[in-house]
Amino acid sequence: MGEPQQVSALPPPPMQYIKEYTDENVRKGLAPKPPPPIRDSYMMFGNQFQCDDLIIRPLESQGIERLHPMQFDHKRELKKLNMSILVNFLDLLDILIKSPGSIKREEKLEDLKLLFVHMHHLINEYRPHQARETLRVMMEVQKRQRLETAERFQKHLERVVEMIQGCLSSLPDDLPLPNSSSMGEAGSAAGSSRLKTEPMDVDDVAGASCMVLQTDKNVPVKKDGVCDNDVVMCRIIDEMT
């Protein structure tokens, strides 16, 4: 027997759309464009809505009779509606028991429908407050997370400072400092390695070549005609100066 196939509770992904949005199609610009935004009207749950409609439309605009006044307490009205729904449901049960075919059954169903519509309308009027409260809670959570992150960074910084101070305190007091002469030689060597960009006189060039020949004694010099002529010229210039 084969292994039992796992069945997902979710519907399968829409393969007709997944095949269109591959990485290659997106890279080549062949992926379908998103649909244009709706600007006039649209259908939702079988009802037509306008884009400029209010988020929560008044009951009168939907052709529904208002049972509560314009100025009211939401909490109190919701409790009244809940109690009215319970009473009308019990009346409907009594009608179904005594006279199921009576016209009062349809009237009671319409009353229950109207009560439920009003209850949902009052609940929907709380949606903006719920959205603001959700946003406030989300921002508080983000603020608390950022403060905790900053506190952890501060603790790590203090630990690093303590480690550096411990390393400094563990160093011996008689630690030899770098010699100034060696530092000077290193500086002169670094300076000599740089190229001079300003123009030089002929005497400076000749003197520099003579100094190089005199100081670089360890460097082997080729005994060819060119090097001998340079040495002779340097000696003549030295005697003239």
Curated annotation (Swiss-Prot):
Biased composition (Low complexity): 175-193
One Gene Ontology CC term in the entry: mediator complex
Principal localisation: nucleus
Alphabetical list of InterPro entries matching this protein: Immune_Mod/Transcr_Coactivator, Med7/Med21-like, Mediatior_Med7, Mediatior_Med7_sf
Keyword Transferase: no
Keyword annotations from UniProtKB, A to Z: Activator, Nucleus, Transcription, Transcription regulation
Pfam families tied to this protein: Med7
GO molecular function: transcription coregulator activity
GO biological process, one term: regulation of transcription by RNA polymerase II
Annotated stretches, region: Disordered: 175-197
Domain of life according to the entry: Eukaryota
Subcellular location: Nucleus
PANTHER family xref list: MEDIATOR OF RNA POLYMERASE II TRANSCRIPTION SUBUNIT 7, T-CELL IMMUNOGLOBULIN AND MUCIN DOMAIN CONTAINING TIM
Complex and partners: Component of the Mediator complex.
Function according to Swiss-Prot or TrEMBL: Component of the Mediator complex, a coactivator involved in the regulated transcription of nearly all RNA polymerase II-dependent genes. Mediator functions as a bridge to convey information from gene-specific regulatory proteins to the basal RNA polymerase II transcription machinery. Mediator is recruited to promoters by direct interactions with regulatory proteins and serves as a scaffold for the assembly of a functional preinitiation complex with RNA polymerase II and the general transcription factors.
Record family assignment: Belongs to the Mediator complex subunit 7 family.
Protein name, per record: Mediator of RNA polymerase II transcription subunit 7
Species annotation: Danio rerio (Zebrafish)
Lineage: Eukaryota, Metazoa, Chordata, Craniata, Vertebrata
